[in-house]
C-alpha cells in the first residue's frame, strides 16, 4: 500500500495512491477545512502562528529558553501541551476532522525536547500530581491528550512518532510512552526523511528499531509489532531510483509506505516500481 502526504487537495484523488493524508493544520499554523476524501492530519503542538500571536503558549526549559525556531535544533515553534485553551481548540479541530472522515492522523504530539516544559503551569501541575518522577508526569500529560483525541475519532487513529526508536529516547525527548499509547493508537507513522536516499542502511536500522520497539521480532519473518507502523519518506526532488530503493527497504519492515509533499515524484516512483514488478524484475542498484 502506497500513500501520499500533501497540502494540495486535488492530489488526494490521484489513483496511484491507496491512501492520502491531507494537512488540515501544519506547523506553520495555517488551517485548511477538513475533507471527506482523505485522512485529515493535524499538527498538534507545533504551531508557528499561535506561538507568534501569544508567546505565553510557548514552552520554556529550566533556564527560561523558549522552544522556538530562534534556537538551535528547533525547526518550528512549539506550544505547551498543558495549555488548556489550546488543547481544547485542538480537540475541537480533531472532532471536525473526524466528522469529515472518521480516520484522523495526529502529528507533532509531545513536548519539544527534554527539560520542557518548566513554565509555572507545568511546575504547579507536576507538584499537585500523583507523580514523583518528572518524566512519568510528562508521559501522563501526553497520554491523556491522545486518549482524549481518540474519543473523538470513531475510525482509525494514526500518530506520528519522532524517528528515534532507541529505548527511553521518545520518553525523555517528548513524553511519549509507546506502551501507554497503544490502547488509543491504531497505527504509528515514522517519518524517515532524507534529501537524496543515496544510502539506505540507516533507514533499515531505524525501521528495524521501531519494529522491535513496538513489540515485533527482530527477524523480518517473525512476529509483527503489537501496533503496526508505517514509514513516511520525503519525495521532493529525490531521484526516482533512489526513492524506489528507499521505499523497498521501508516496505520490508513497515506496514505501508507514504510519500511526503511531492505527488508527481511519488507517482513516478510507484509507476516505475509497478512496471518493474510486472516485468518480473527485482529492483536494485546498477
Set out the residue ranges of the language-model regions.
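Substrate-binding cleft/loops of secretory-pathway carbohydrate-active enzymes
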Residues: 15, 156-197, 246-250
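An active-site-proximal structural segment forming one wall of the substrate-binding cleft
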Residues: 78-110, 152, 177-181
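Active-site-adjacent "subsite" loops/lids of carbohydrate-active enzymes
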Residues: 40-95
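The substrate-binding groove and active-site-proximal loops of carbohydrate-active enzymes
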Residues: 19-22, 72-91, 133-140, 191-196, ...
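Substrate-binding cleft of secreted/luminal carbohydrate-active enzymes
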Residues: 192-199, 221, 227-286
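Active-site-proximal loop/short-helix segments
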Residues: 103-133
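Catalytic domains of carbohydrate-active enzymes, especially glycoside hydrolases
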Residues: 1-34, 96-103, 181-187, 250-257
Amino acid at each position: 500500500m502506497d500513500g501520499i502526504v500533501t497540502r494540495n487537495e486535488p492530489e488526494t484523488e490521484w489513483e496511484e495512491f491507496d491512501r492520502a493524508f491531507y494537512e488540515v493544520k501544519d506547523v506553520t499554523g495555517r488551517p485548511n477545512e477538513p475533507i471527506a476524501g482523505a485522512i485529515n492530519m493535524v499538527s498538534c503542538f507545533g504551531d508557528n502562528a499561535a506561538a507568534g500571536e501569544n508567546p505565553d503558549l510557548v514552552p520554556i526549559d529550566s533556564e527560561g529558553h523558549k522552544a522556538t525556531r530562534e534556537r538551535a535544533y528547533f525547526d518550528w515553534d512549539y506550544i505547551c501541551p498543558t495549555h488548556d485553551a489550546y488543547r481544547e481548540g485542538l480537540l475541537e479541530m480533531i472532532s471536525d476532522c473526524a466528522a469529515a472522515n472518521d480516520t484522523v492522523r495526529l502529528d507533532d504530539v509531545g513536548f519539544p525536547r527534554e527539560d520542557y516544559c518548566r513554565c509555572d503551569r507545568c511546575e504547579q501541575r507536576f507538584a499537585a500530581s500523583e507523580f514523583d518522577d518528572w518524566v512519568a508526569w510528562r508521559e501522563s500529560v501526553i497520554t491523556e491528550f491522545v486518549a482524549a483525541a481518540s474519543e473523538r475519532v470513531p475510525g482509525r487513529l494514526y500518530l506520528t512518532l519522532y524517528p528515534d526508536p532507541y529505548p527511553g529516547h521518545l520518553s525523555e525527548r517528548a513524553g511519549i510512552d509507546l506502551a501507554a499509547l497503544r490502547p488509543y493508537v491504531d497505527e504509528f507513522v515514522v517519518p524517515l526523511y532524507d534529501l537524496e536516499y543515496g544510502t539506505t542502511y540507516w533507514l533499515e536500522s531505524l525501521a528495524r528499531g521501531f519494529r522491535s520497539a513496538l513489540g515485533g521480532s527482530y527477524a523480518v519473518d517473525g512476529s509483527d509489532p503489537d501496533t503496526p507502523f508505517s514509514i513516511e519518506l520525503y519525495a521532493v526532488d529525490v531521484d526516482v531510483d533512489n526513492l524506489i530503493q528507499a521505499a523497498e527497504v521501508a516496505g520490508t519492515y513497515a506496514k505501508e509506505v507514504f510519500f511526503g509533499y511531492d505527488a508527481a515524484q511519488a507517482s513516478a516512483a510507484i509507476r516505475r516500481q509497478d512496471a518493474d514488478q510486472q516485468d518480473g524484475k527485482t529492483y536494485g542498484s546498477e
